[in-house]
Amino acid sequence: MAKISKKLSAAYEGIDKQKAYPLFDAIKLAQEKSITKFDGSINIAVKLNLDTTKVEQQLRGSISLPNGNGKNVRVLVLSEDITKEQAAAVGADYFGGADYIQNIEKMLNQIDVIITNQKMMPLLAKLGKVLGPRGLMPNPKIGTVTNDVLKAVEEFKKGRIEYRTDTYGNIHMSIGRVSFETAKIEENANALLSLIRSKKPATVKGQYIQNIAISPTMGPGIKVIINNN
């Protein structure tokens, strides 16, 4: 633990904690200051001026990052309208129909996304208390309840990911890997920020985006200059 703290302290050297950096520079610094031995994530945290007790100020959806985020998303497809072979052909990791739902609780640590259609949702409702807190409950807002299951699988395997505000109005997301080209991570970040700006609720007053920070899986957080509020 002491060794990690020492590495983290060293990683902060050369970074002005009071300064906000241009987005490209912040990403580059986060890549350079990562202290993991593996190819860690580059993450973005966006603080928004939202009152999340109001439903209209709770943001949730999904986005296809231009360059993906480097994560292998494990997809479970629940459908009786397509075959296992069709699902596998577009990259699904697991597949089943109504009788497969009983297996889900045993494999929560093996799946990242469940994609299904509206017909299956009543059967999944009984697992709401299990799937909801883990962010696994399919939802049409994020494209995981759809009539075109095969297309949705392709999109999520290519890098479509969910975004949502937490209780405090923050959005946290992985936007790439340390090994990515900096420009590609910047492109991902700009795509997300553009989407967030487009989703600004009409009832929000004052500065909408209050803070942006970039950080590696392990390493310092770096403030970003906020533009176009």
From Swiss-Prot:
CDD domains xrefs: Ribosomal_L1
MF terms in GO: rRNA binding; structural constituent of ribosome; tRNA binding
An individual GO BP term: translation
InterPro entries: Ribosom_uL1_bac-type, Ribosomal_uL1, Ribosomal_uL1-like, Ribosomal_uL1/biogenesis, Ribosomal_uL1_3-a/b-sand, Ribosomal_uL1_CS
SUPFAM superfamilies in UniProt: Ribosomal protein L1 (SSF56808)
GO cellular component, one term: large ribosomal subunit
Source species, domain of life: Bacteria
Keywords: Repressor, Ribonucleoprotein, Ribosomal protein, RNA-binding, rRNA-binding, Translation regulation, tRNA-binding
PANTHER family noted in UniProt: 54S RIBOSOMAL PROTEIN L1, MITOCHONDRIAL (PTHR36427), LARGE RIBOSOMAL SUBUNIT PROTEIN UL1M (PTHR36427:SF3)
Family, as annotated: Belongs to the universal ribosomal protein uL1 family.
Biological function: Binds directly to 23S rRNA. The L1 stalk is quite mobile in the ribosome, and is involved in E site tRNA release. Protein L1 is also a translational repressor protein, it controls the translation of the L11 operon by binding to its mRNA.
Subunit structure: Part of the 50S ribosomal subunit.
Name of the protein in question: Large ribosomal subunit protein uL1
Lineage: Bacteria, Bacillati, Mycoplasmatota, Mycoplasmoidales, Mycoplasmoidaceae
